[in-house]
């Protein structure tokens, strides 16, 4: 699908583009090479829900900044498809996490990898962008680069990877960074200090800020929504026959089918234990944008032990409104832990995996926490229930304290303010990028910074 950027759609003067384009020609940038073909071709791949969100926003920002029409191809979810991507296959086919959990899916994984490589070569992209999902992404980029050399293709596409691997979390992680430069031209880092470490190991990188910061710029995150004001499935709480003085907990079991299958039964048993201390307990079960997850939760819904309402995917504001109507949250470890902090909603992070994967994590991990807020603040601001500690009795006990202990709740709110500052790149770190785009600094989101870097990139 072709996207034409006209003068009327530009958020800043066309003269800005003319000036930028002249400098790009001299530097033989991505946009200069694309100009020869009269369009910018971007092959973009995401393998999970959080990556679909990042990818869709990057696509929007590229269309906003590019002086050329853009054509997209690759793999993504519903959000990326809404921006014009015709996904090669369902993104859920790649949503597998863990070493041992991957084994049953290896054949399908290899088939999808070959299909993606063949499609990328046929598409002849100027830019390849992979988003997170490093297992699939790095194999794709590595084999693509090998294919270029094998076919002696000149002026091959530039490779970007969005979300640097968590090298800081694993023993020996930094030592493996150097090898990335063989198939990744530029990394987009979402955490402070990652850019510096990547560059020290020979990998070009830019700290663009954490993707959830875009939620803060677009939505009202900390609005305290009274339960009776919240509309879910088209109905208010009262229309769902739920009292306005209910104790409301948001439950977020994950975005991948394998983790939801593992976590939801544990969460269900924990809610059953909370029925006695909180007789008016109600849960808001957040459903990820994943058809397999949607189906599984739908089938499990009838066995849920307390009154519950499903919060569908597709509306970020609805998600944050549901957070605002809740007194606490129980979530599987992931990006959502940061989203809950932005919403100032006290939460408990839980995680279980295959026992062999858990053993590997214990052996290889060099940090004591699993949730990003705790890692960045180097403090257990958010309680974590991991591995064997992730059992119904312990989850119920921690949630009860979280609902009743004001000091425990306040600690998370204070920590959230510190976290937001850490996740945002300072104006000085952005260098001249703000001036290159013509955007005011307060509108310089992570995806805009990434898009600007892609368009102005010139391989050394």
Curated annotation (Swiss-Prot):
Q: A GO molecular-function term, please?
A: lipid-A-disaccharide synthase activity
The protein's annotated catalytic reaction(s) are: a lipid X + a UDP-2-N,3-O-bis[(3R)-3-hydroxyacyl]-alpha-D-glucosamine = a lipid A disaccharide + UDP + H(+)
Annotated signal peptide:
none
Instruction: Look up keyword Transit peptide and say if it applies.
Output: yes
Q: What is the taxonomic lineage of the source species? A: Eukaryota, Viridiplantae, Streptophyta, Embryophyta, Tracheophyta
Query: What Pfam families does the annotation carry?
Result: LpxB
Subcellular location per UniProt equals: Mitochondrion
- What is the protein named? Probable lipid-A-disaccharide synthase, mitochondrial
Tell me which stretches of the chain form a coiled coil: none
Question: Which region of this protein is its transit peptide?
Answer: 1-58
Q: Which top-rank group of organisms is this from?
A: Eukaryota
Q: Membrane-spanning regions, if any? A: none
Biological process terms from the Gene Ontology for this record are: lipid A biosynthetic process; lipid X metabolic process
Per the similarity annotation, which family is this?
A: Belongs to the LpxB family.
Q: What does this protein do?
A: Condensation of UDP-2,3-diacylglucosamine and 2,3-diacylglucosamine-1-phosphate to form lipid A disaccharide, a precursor of lipid A, a phosphorylated glycolipid that in bacteria anchors the lipopolysaccharide to the outer membrane of the cell. Lipid A-like molecules in plants may serve as structural components of the outer membranes of mitochondria and/or chloroplasts, or may be involved in signal transduction or plant defense responses (Potential).
Biological source species: Arabidopsis thaliana
Could you say what a knockout of this gene produces? No visible phenotype under normal growth conditions, but plants lacking LPXB accumulate high levels of 2,3-diacylglucosamine-1-phosphate and UDP-2,3-diacylglucosamine.
Q: What is its EC number?
A: 2.4.1.182
Tell me which UniProt keywords the record has, alphabetically.
Glycosyltransferase, Lipid A biosynthesis, Lipid biosynthesis, Lipid metabolism, Mitochondrion, Transferase, Transit peptide
Annotated Gene Ontology cellular component terms: membrane; mitochondrion
- What is the uppermost EC class here? transferase
Q: Which biological pathway?
A: Glycolipid biosynthesis; lipid IV(A) biosynthesis; lipid IV(A) from (3R)-3-hydroxytetradecanoyl-[acyl-carrier-protein] and UDP-N-acetyl-alpha-D-glucosamine: step 5/6
| Chief location | mitochondrion
For whether the record's keyword set contains Mitochondrion, the answer is yes
